[in-house]
């Protein structure tokens, strides 16, 4: 006797088949799309340097929900709990401050050995790893400048940190058999009116060129650079603007990172994908949810998340676009935040794969915009949820909201026992 989920799956499959959509082929494709989940949701971007310093760089994690991870083992345990509730392929995105060492390590001296435990853990869980140098929350970034700093000694420190980070990223790729995407974002900017913008950008350009000068195998490591409109304390001038990094990625052949919260509130990165991909070899996406500013709220299954997925799938860019998440909400259960956001990204990808894109494309090419709009709206109410629940069951993942019960149980038995 079939279950309600199985019955719904068979009905959904037939409904989509009537529109010439192969649901099983869509699920096979979904199984080839990893989403890179960010580790820093689990501890509010604290890391394991244990310096006691504040989070800086014009970013904030607001809230004080109990039970955040404070050790590498706690963070990995929390990640495992989240991964168990998310179907399909996944990656983990690490920042340099998540190193493990018995002794303090200067950021310009970090090495693969400080991330060996992460690599062994990733092997056990069949995960790829991505990486980021951490150019904030440090005494040498306290004045708001790193790679564009006027002081050559400070600038040299951050150049060396990024160079060391690239070698760690390449180590990830070699060990795990999948390239690590390493994204460079720096908080460099000015609170108020800035006279010599060009000098700051010239220094950043020179520093980046020095950082990527060491040849690394792209089968192991991919460079990416990320812009931002502004940050707290850098409202008037950001050195690494969109124009700067688009030009840099296009001229140097790096990937360009588009963060959903790093543009003006009236801009969306879904509209930028098809333009930027004409000029750069790859894109890295930081899917987030900005609420009036780069607030990094948990990703919803909203119009923009869906539009991002549509742009990737419609233009067959899955081999050139790397999907990562970037949010950190300390006001709710952090494991639930991971699960909600990552499942929503995967749901958006599934819905995009189930779209009758070629039919819509022909309508557009023929100028039948009435039918295009009608079909776009009608397909929103097709039974994609039944397909999603079947997909979850195929991966031994709880399909509906019942997953929250497991999170609550983990919270009661594990998170409530933690200090702080």
UniProtKB/Swiss-Prot annotation:
InterPro entries: L-rhamnose_isomerase, Rhamnose_isomerase, Xyl_isomerase-like_sf. Keywords: Cytoplasm, Isomerase, Manganese, Metal-binding, Rhamnose metabolism. Mn(2+) binds at residues 262, 294, 296. GO terms for molecular function: L-rhamnose isomerase activity; manganese ion binding. Binds 1 Mn(2+) ion per subunit. Its EC number is 5.3.1.14. It is an enzyme of class 5 (isomerase). The keyword rRNA processing does not apply. It catalyses: L-rhamnopyranose = L-rhamnulose. Belongs to the rhamnose isomerase family. This is L-rhamnose isomerase. The lineage of its organism: Bacteria, Pseudomonadati, Pseudomonadota, Gammaproteobacteria, Enterobacterales.
């Amino acid at each position: 006797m079939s279950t309600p989920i199985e019955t719904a799956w068979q009905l959904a499959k037939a409904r989509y088949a009537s529109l010439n959509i192969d649901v099983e082929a869509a699920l096979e494709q979904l199984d080839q799309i990893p989403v890179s989940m960010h580790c820093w949701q689990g501890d509010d971007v604290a890391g394991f340097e244990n310096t006691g310093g504040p989070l800086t760089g014009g970013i904030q994690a607001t809230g004080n929900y109990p039970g955040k991870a404070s050790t590498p083992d706690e963070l990995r345990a929390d990640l495992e709990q989240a991964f168990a509730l998310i179907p399909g392929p996944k990656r983990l995105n690490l920042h340099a401050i998540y190193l493990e060492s018995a002794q303090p390590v200067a950021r310009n001296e970090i090495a693969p050995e400080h991330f060996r435990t992460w690599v062994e853990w990733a092997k056990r869980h069949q995960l790829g790893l991505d990486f980021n140098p951490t150019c904030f929350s440090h005494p040498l970034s306290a004045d708001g400048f790193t790679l564009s700093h006027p002081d050559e000694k400070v600038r040299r420190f951050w150049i060396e940190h990024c160079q060391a980070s690239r070698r760690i990223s390449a180590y990830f790729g070699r060990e795990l058999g999948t390239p690590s995407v390493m994204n460079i974002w720096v908080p460099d900017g000015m609170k108020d009116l800035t006279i010599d913008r060009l000098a700051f950008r010239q220094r950043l350009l020179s520093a980046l060129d020095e950082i990527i000068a060491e040849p690394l195998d792209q089968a192991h490591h991919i460079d990416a650079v990320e812009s931002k409109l502004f940050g707290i304390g850098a409202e008037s001038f950001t050195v690494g603007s969109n124009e700067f990094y688009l030009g840099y990625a296009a001229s140097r052949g790096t990937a360009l990172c588009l963060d959903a919260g790093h543009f003006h509130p009236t801009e969306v990165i879904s509209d930028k994908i098809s333009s930027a991909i004409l000029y750069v070899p790859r894109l890295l996406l930081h899917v987030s949810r900005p609420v009036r500013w780069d607030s990094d709220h948990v990703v919803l299954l909203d119009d923009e998340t869906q539009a991002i997925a549509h742009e990737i799938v419609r233009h067959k860019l899955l081999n050139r676009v790397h999907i990562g998440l970037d949010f950190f909400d300390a006001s709710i259960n952090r494991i639930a935040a991971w699960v909600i956001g990552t499942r929503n990204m995967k749901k958006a990808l599934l819905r995009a794969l189930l779209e009758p894109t070629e039919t819509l494309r022909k309508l557009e090419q023929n100028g039948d915009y009435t039918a295009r709009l009608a079909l776009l709206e009608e397909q929103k109410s097709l039974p994609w949820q039944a397909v999603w629940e079947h997909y979850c069951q195929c991966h031994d993942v709880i399909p509906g909201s019942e997953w929250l019960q497991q999170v609550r149980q983990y919270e009661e038995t594990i998170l409530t026992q933690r200090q702080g």
